[in-house]
């Protein structure tokens, strides 16, 4: 009889597209993962994957098994959640810790897909101003997964989601001109900026890129809320540095890439042995997270 662990190994290979990435995601060795899949293939009497040089594809047997294996793993997760719920634990709730800008940008679309597949699993979103408090929340066991800039020295699992660009928002009218979607930050040295409150994750980002351009930013307004920055810029207060993912499609100002460039790596971090629900969420996040919205990319081109 196939085991849930074998099904999980098989499904993770499908989700990740290779045995190497699947082993990294599950926190096991590649030979150990291959043994789990091989045991499942022996149990079923057929191969599940066609091994290609850099990827894998499903055989007819592998495709036939897929919906049933997912149903088994999902049913096991629901059974575990139900049992723990009766016991008074927090099962059945996915706790997501995220940097403010992540909650505004990439998470809404991912959560829409997640809720469609897991309508009975509650989601609790815990938002943080800095990577330090985000990491501390994970270390204290307050969240199942954290999403933000890659934390240094994290001892659990780290799934890199990609590189997030920080862009400069400028008021609709007035100098300086934006050329080919770029602007030298040094041209904004004498302009008062929309800055963030001390301790906010993006306050340090603006200070760092301005320092690289040879100036210290003057401040017109400080805001606690990342979502407020585009509104202040559109009102003509001054420029702001924001993650590309939080720029609303309705933004009426101008958008430019800063020179020098500003970007950061985003990752999802979990404990060393995340449960099935958390692992499934991280896999979905890695597949569907959008770090550069099409409407922003179009205006930068």
What do the PLM-derived regions correspond to, one by one?
Residues 156-193:
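Flexible hinge/capping segments at coil-to-helix
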Residues 155-160, 164, 227-274:
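Beta-alpha-beta core module
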Residues 12-29:
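Short helix-boundary/capping micro-motifs
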Residues 41-63:
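A short LG(V/I)-centered, amphipathic sequence patch enriched
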Residues 91-153:
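Central regulatory/effector-binding core of bacterial HTH transcription factors
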Residues 254-301:
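A late-sequence structural motif
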Residues 131-134, 139-142, 149, 199-254:
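Hydrophobic hinge/microswitch elements
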Residues 7, 11, 43-44, 65-87:
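Alpha-helical linker/hinge and terminal dimerization helices associated
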């Amino acid at each position: 009889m196939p085991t849930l662990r074998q099904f999980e190994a098989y499904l993770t290979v499908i989700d990740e597209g290779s045995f190497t990435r699947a082993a990294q995601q599950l926190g096991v060795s590649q030979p150990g993962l291959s043994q789990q899949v091989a045991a499942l293939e022996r149990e079923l009497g057929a191969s599940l994957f066609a091994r290609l040089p850099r990827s894998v594809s499903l055989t007819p047997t592998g495709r036939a098994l897929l919906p049933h294996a997912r149903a088994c793993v999902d049913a096991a997760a629901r059974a575990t959640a139900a049992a723990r719920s009766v016991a008074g634990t927090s099962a059945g709730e996915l706790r997501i810790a995220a940097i403010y800008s992540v909650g505004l940008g990439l998470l809404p679309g991912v959560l829409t897909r997640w809720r469609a597949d897991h309508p009975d699993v509650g989601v609790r979103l815990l938002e943080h101003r800095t990577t330090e408090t985000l990491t501390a929340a994970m270390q204290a066991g307050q969240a199942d997964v954290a999403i933000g800039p890659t934390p240094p020295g994290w001892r659990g699992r780290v799934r890199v989601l990609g590189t997030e660009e920080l862009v400069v928002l400028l008021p609709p009218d007035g100098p300086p001109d934006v050329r080919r979607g770029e602007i030298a930050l040094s041209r904004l040295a004498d302009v008062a900026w929309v800055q963030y409150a001390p301790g906010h994750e993006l306050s340090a980002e603006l200070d760092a890129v301005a320092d690289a351009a040879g100036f210290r930013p003057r401040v017109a307004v400080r805001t606690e809320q990342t979502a407020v920055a585009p509104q202040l810029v559109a009102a003509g207060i001054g420029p702001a540095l924001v993650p590309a993912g939080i720029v609303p499609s309705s933004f009426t100002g101008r958008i430019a890439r800063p020179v020098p460039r500003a970007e950061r790596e985003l990752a999802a971090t979990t404990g060393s042995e995340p449960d099935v629900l958390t692992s499934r969420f991280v896999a979905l996040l890695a597949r569907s997270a959008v770090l550069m919205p099409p409407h922003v990319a179009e205006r930068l081109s």
